[in-house]
């Protein structure tokens, strides 16, 4: 699992946010496009791309994309 690829997969779940807005330190819940549907898309992306299951509570516990990456990598 690679952080760069994870960020690309994460960014692909957003339609209107430019790719350059996504970095390891991005606080994803502050993005204008972030909402409950996007959260579900991220949960599905983690399941589909990495064969790992996360919950909404797991997602809420993360602040940055790197936090989420580290959590998923630890599973």
Give the ranges of each region predicted by the language model.
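Phosphopantetheine-dependent thiolation modules in NRPS/PKS and related acyl-activating systems
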Residues: 1-34, 38-43, 48-75
